[in-house]
Amino acid sequence: MKKQIISLGALAVASSLFTWDNKADAIVTKDYSKESRVNEKSKKGATVSDYYYWKIIDSLEAQFTGAIDLLENYKYGDPIYKEAKDRLMTRVLGEDQYLLKKKIDEYELYKKWYKSSNKNTNMLTFHKYNLYNLTMNEYNDIFNSLKDAVYQFNKEVKEIEHKNVDLKQFDKDGEDKATKEVYDLVSEIDTLVVTYYADKDYGEHAKELRAKLDLILGDTDNPHKITNERIKKEMIDDLNSIIDDFFMETKQNRPNSITKYDPTKHNFKEKSENKPNFDKLVEETKKAVKEADESWKNKTVKKYEETVTKSPVVKEEKKVEEPQLPKVGNQQEVKTTAGKAEETTQPVAQPLVKIPQETIYGETVKGPEYPTMENKTLQGEIVQGPDFLTMEQNRPSLSDNYTQPTTPNPILEGLEGSSSKLEIKPQGTESTLKGIQGESSDIEVKPQATETTEASQYGPRPQFNKTPKYVKYRDAGTGIREYNDGTFGYEARPRFNKPSETNAYNVTTNQDGTVSYGARPTQNKPSETNAYNVTTHANGQVSYGARPTQNKPSKTNAYNVTTHANGQVSYGARPTQKKPSKTNAYNVTTHANGQVSYGARPTYKKPSETNAYNVTTHANGQVSYGARPTQKKPSETNAYNVTTHADGTATYGPRVTK
């Protein structure tokens, strides 16, 4: 039985209809279905057989996943790659929407068939239904389309890197050298964090510094790689920027040099004997900061000015005991009262680009009428999952923006004859999309409550030297975010509803698409032949025997080859076909049982013959060698009375007496 297809591409709006039921309305900003490269003639070919069905699906899934991995690659986060990435994204979305539309059309036919057949079983929901009528030609077109898109993307990347020397990829030694240079600066930040982490005045600033550092470097398990000169320079600028911010916010001076934190010397939690070294490091750092002058302010990455800002007042206080990961989309309000406003003067970086405050427009498209999703919500209600923190598609450069733009409530105007109002209300950790089939509805998107810190006297975080970036739209079904610069961010990939599967090499593909590796096979296992006569040998190689005969009796054919009931084959002597033994002209005898024996080579009844070189070929084929001819030289007797005659023979006379 074929399994279910969830969205193969799992991207943007296309994937939402694979995973949401008929009550969900999707916000569509662009129709990508025309971007598909599937030929019209391919739709009328033969469908994929049951035997190859999931091999085909796995192959397509691998194609989509490979393309998405390229789009998410950290080194392609620079804006110079945007056009190439957009072209690849467009192709992926086009093929994904083609599969979506095909499934929608097929499901409509299935509903009509179900209603007319009076089945006693429950009708399958849309996300449980299988896309059966996929032709082999359609698969080939989609596969080749994605393959070509990836090829063109890699080709454009090479051209871009050829024109921009600072984007040329480092070799192994170059990458190691650049990484060391960056992490030397990281060690200085670690020193500041451990020095002021428990400080009553600067502890919160130290924790914030650590959160910014984690954002620049990436996940601990998958840190950003420093693969070219531009990434190295931007990362160093970002690190220097957050160090400058720390000293500016704490109203201290940055020393010219800071002792680098070394875990092998200063980590006293792992080794208690390192406690004196740690205390010495803290003392040296505080002393260096105290003795530093203000000359460092002339060397900062960005310019700081005195400005009057409104102090953000957080609704709810919550002390942070441990370093927290930076939150995306923290909701803060500027509290103003009649006749009073809390104002303070703080040094902040001035924004270089004005944050857009206009209304965001989109298209509200009514979702198709499908049955409700199982194991999700009650009829007519879909619950959005928690807003997980994710690594975005582009590098989260700290030079982008630290400010949280206060955007007005966007109004999404529909194109279906009625408008849908988007009302933003604060609530818990989930948002609910409500709608009634057959009716247009108002959508209430209630943002999640986020963690807050203690109320601070500091104003908004300073902007850096790049265009501010904020979330323009977030798809509720997939968690995919679209930013104001046209880029996308992704959350965890959707499950494909497949059970975990472990192959012959002990590699397990889990339900969420991740892969885990077990111990490698010991290779010391004996050869094993399964019911299909396929033998797996001890070295992992596979050999194929004859296909089993499915309980048929043993059968021997005209060539004395016997196929047994278990599918094995044995070979008997070649049949003699009742012919007598036969000896050919070369004295080779083929006997009645098929064996062959070789006699002496025939002499052809020729007499012995001696050639000019005194080599004699006898009648039985043997050869004997005489003395080499003397070439008509006269007989010659040497001092020992041995005579060599003209024909090469030698005669011996009596020995010479002295």
From Swiss-Prot:
Gene3D superfamilies to which the protein is assigned, alphabetical: Staphylcoagulase, helix bundle domain 1, Staphylcoagulase, helix bundle, domain 2
Keywords recorded for this protein, A-Z: Prothrombin activator, Repeat, Signal
Sequence repeats: 492-518, 519-545, 546-572, 573-599, 600-626, 627-653
InterPro entries: Staphylcoagulase_N_1, Staphylcoagulase_N_2, Staphylcoagulase_rpt, Staphylocoagulase_N
Disordered: region residues: 391-531, 619-658
PROSITE patterns, alphabetized: STAPHYLOCOAGULASE
GO MF terms, alphabetically ordered: peptidase activator activity
Pfam assignment, any one: Staphylcoagulse
Biased composition (Polar residues): 391-406, 428-440, 499-514, 521-531, 636-646
Family: Belongs to the staphylocoagulase family.
Domain notes: The C-terminal tandem repeats are not required for the procoagulant activity.
Role noted for this protein: Staphylocoagulase is an extracellular protein which specifically forms a complex with human prothrombin. This complex named staphylothrombin can clot fibrinogen without any proteolytic cleavage of prothrombin.
Protein name: Staphylocoagulase
Organism: Staphylococcus aureus
